[in-house]
Amino acid sequence: MATPHINAEMGDFADVVLMPGDPIRAKYIAETFLDDVVQVCDVRNMYGFTGTYKGRKISVMGHGMGIPSCSIYMTELIKDFGVKKVIRVGSCGAVNEGIKVRDVVIGMGACTDSKVNRIRFKDHDFAAIADYEMVRNAELAAQARGIDVKVGNLFSAELFYTPDPSMFDLMDKYGIVGVEMEAAGMYGVAAEYGAKALAICTVSDHIKTGEQTTSDERATTFDEMMLIALDSVLLGDK
């Protein structure tokens, strides 16, 4: 039955959901890559769709910006709609010179300045990591398409406009492959509810050089990331 934030019914969603932050990107993914698409929810214009990719039922739904928004949608999808795997397909910023705009990065783990996982883990450090098989399948899917990917730690920031830009130098030193706002929270939700999760991101801007993509590009391109995510789902079924 419908939840406060998702007006769908049990069975409307596939067991695997791709989740971009932007609901317009969710619509783009559904219309571009899926067949037999049905819109299944639209509360607060956070669109959700279900269709098939090469015959495999897959859903896609936006999650908004930041850990709180992402956690709400992901929790309801898992608890109330039977979703087993969530793949974030979003954008991130780069801090390392070896990572360029439009590169694809896979979040094997996620650091954060949020306290959300300490709240759920009785104030202890929780190692927020992706599901290993999902990481492996995403890397294999990328290799099969000849797409170079970077695998490593993301940093999930609470603030988009940080008051301490020197933190980016520390992230670079520690080998952070991308800065975004959700992965650490979604890995915590997955662990709490016994689901599996992975964040795949395309670098939309470089924090050090200032190079960036446009909002239109972020909403309607980044196709390599989508194909990696979709192909990885098929590999996970084997």
Swiss-Prot record:
The active site is at D205 (proton donor). GO terms for biological process: purine nucleoside catabolic process. It catalyses: a purine D-ribonucleoside + phosphate = a purine nucleobase + alpha-D-ribose 1-phosphate; a purine 2'-deoxy-D-ribonucleoside + phosphate = a purine nucleobase + 2-deoxy-alpha-D-ribose 1-phosphate. The keyword Ribosomal protein does not apply. Keywords: Glycosyltransferase, Transferase. The record marks R218 as: Important for catalytic activity. The keyword Glycosyltransferase applies. Phosphate binds at G21, R25, R44, R88, V89, G90, S91. Belongs to the PNP/UDP phosphorylase family. This is Purine nucleoside phosphorylase DeoD-type 1.
